[in-house]
Amino acid sequence: MPVLHNRISNDALKAKMLAESEPRITISFYKYFHIADPKATRDALYQLFTALDVFGRVYLAHEGINAQISVPASNVETFRAQLYAFDPALEGLRLNIALDDDGKSFWVLRMKVRDRIVSDGIDDPHFDASNVGEYLQAAEVNAMLDDPDALFIDMRNHYEYEVGHFENALEIPADTFREQLPKAVEMMQAHKDKKIVMYCTGGIRCEKASAWMKHNGFNKVWHIEGGIIEYARKAREQGLPVRFIGKNFVFDERMGERISDEIIAHCHQCGAPCDSHTNCKNDGCHLLFIQCPVCAEKYKGCCSEICCEESALPPEEQRRRRAGRENSNKIFNKSRGRLNTTLGIPDPTE
């Protein structure tokens, strides 16, 4: 029986990936379709992906698959062919190719079975996730942006919206997708006569959100096919104005794809224009925040003077402090007043 999970340390895997000479392509895809046996499907896909030297993060559930991966450039077409042949539901599936890619997005393959491929918190048995809004292509998106009767709803988290969004798009203030869904319905109650356009990074969240809005009585609902990634790619290919402003946050080592030259966010420490996310270098914190180069040098990559001081302590003392600290993984985010319980890059499906 082949080993169906990784047994090598993260540090060793990352060093191996960085030493590779062959370029890699970062790809994301999702598909809502019924998987009768997610565990068996997971194991079969794990072997397929491993044979093609694919890295990344893949979730499977009875409702479908959600993947963000890195594929050696020479294996991309083989990967595409084998994925399409794996299940009839995956034939012709759109693969979102990263826009701003250094090929160093992932260094390990993690494939998990979950209850949902997106944590939505929906327990309504009458909800039909297949009853989605209409797709919008790039030219149609631009036309909608000029339509005074249309409202664009950003179905991403605050830290994503902060560094980039469509012109005049509304933010749904929440830290997780499951919190956003009821808030979106509540915020839009007075606008049921409007055209609601929903979007996210690659399409998976806004597709489900469009179905949720329709379930709650909204009839004029659209969502952007392929999300921000596919919109920007098609707009550029077709010579259309790209109406997304700033950077598209992505959930891998890159932490962002530059879409436009505008920098709309600010350093959380000094307020200078900046849209570069980082994780606090203090191993007892790892808060995701925006930090400019000046503050990165001043605070040694940490989010505060306290974390800077703690990260300079001997490793044993740092471990002792972390072990004795209650709720050590709940770090207050001064920029938003929220608790961050994630160490490292956030999970896009939460």
From Swiss-Prot:
EC number(s) recorded for this UniProt protein: 1.14.-.-
A GO BP entry: tRNA modification
Listed CDD domains: RHOD_YceA (cd01518)
Record's keyword terms, sorted: Oxidoreductase, tRNA processing
Entries under SUPFAM superfamilies matching the protein: Rhodanese/Cell cycle control phosphatase (SSF52821)
PROSITE patterns the record matches: RHODANESE_3 (PS50206)
Span of domain Rhodanese: 146-240
Function: Catalyzes oxygen-dependent 5-hydroxyuridine (ho5U) modification at position 34 in tRNAs, the first step in 5-carboxymethoxyuridine (cmo5U) biosynthesis. May be part of an alternate pathway, which is able to bypass cmo5U biogenesis in a subset of tRNAs under aerobic conditions.
Annotated HAMAP family: TrhO (MF_00469)
Family: Belongs to the TrhO family.
Protein known as: tRNA uridine(34) hydroxylase
Organism of derivation: Escherichia coli O127:H6 (strain E2348/69 / EPEC)
